[in-house]
């Protein structure tokens, strides 16, 4: 069963066609790779899923229902342009975002502590974001993305800026989240990450889907 579906989604900005009747289907509890070069349309599709912008035509479905604005709480989004407030303390900021997504203060605190310990950033709780390395900041934003345990997780180039050790840590956590029931969409141009993680892929180029299917089947064709 598909957790998320986009059916013939089209989006145009002025004279630029960003998406041309794009359809994707993401199976529940899977890791789905959205591949393509810069400007292919990947980020536009992600923004439409997150209700940052709307399609000109086409339909989006989440869990068998048409996607509605209030469904955004069921989505966790890690954008390529990271967005933590530099002057705010790390722990305080993650708690704030968690409560915006519907968690009680006590539950937000418990989950944040768990993930900070797991990712070995607990010592940075009271540090300002600007005091953290880029990798540490990305770990903190990763925690913010997953903390409310959304049905659909969207990661846009999640490994950019990580050294190989920390990239491996995050890859393992993404696999762990899938085992716990999450459905993951991640956008990348890195084929090796796709082969390591993804069950299914969709390749977008010049606003259109040009290849889609199971990774193991595509690899063997």
Regions found by a protein language model. Name each.
Residues 216-221:
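Short acidic-hydrophobic catalytic motif
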Residues 1:
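Flanking scaffold residues of small Cys/His-coordinated metal-binding clusters
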Residues 4, 11-205, 209-211:
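ABC transporter nucleotide-binding domains
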């Amino acid at each position: 069963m598909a957790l998320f579906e986009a059916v013939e989604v089209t989006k145009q900005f002025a004279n630029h066609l960003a998406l041309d009747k794009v359809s994707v289907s993401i199976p529940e509890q899977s890791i789905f790779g959205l591949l393509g070069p810069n400007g292919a349309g990947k980020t536009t599709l992600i923004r439409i899923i997150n209700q940052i912008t709307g399609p000109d035509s086409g339909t989006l479905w989440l869990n068998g229902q048409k996607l509605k604005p209030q469904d955004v709480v069921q989505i966790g989004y890690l954008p390529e342009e990271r967005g933590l407030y530099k002057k705010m303390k790390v722990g305080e900021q993650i708690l704030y975002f968690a409560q915006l997504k519907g968690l009680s203060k006590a539950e937000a605190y418990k989950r944040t502590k768990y993930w900070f310990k797991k990712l070995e950033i607990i010592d940075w709780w009271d540090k300002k974001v600007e005091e953290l390395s880029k990798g540490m900041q990305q770990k903190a934003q990763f925690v913010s993305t997953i903390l409310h345990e959304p049905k659909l997780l969207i990661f846009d180039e999640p490994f950019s800026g990580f050294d190989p050790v920390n990239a491996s840590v995050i890859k393992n956590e993404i696999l762990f989240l899938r085992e716990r029931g999450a459905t993951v969409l991640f956008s990348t141009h890195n084929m090796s990450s796709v082969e390591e993680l993804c069950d299914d892929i969709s390749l977008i180029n010049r606003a259109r889907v040009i290849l889609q299917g199971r990774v193991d089947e595509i690899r063997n064709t």
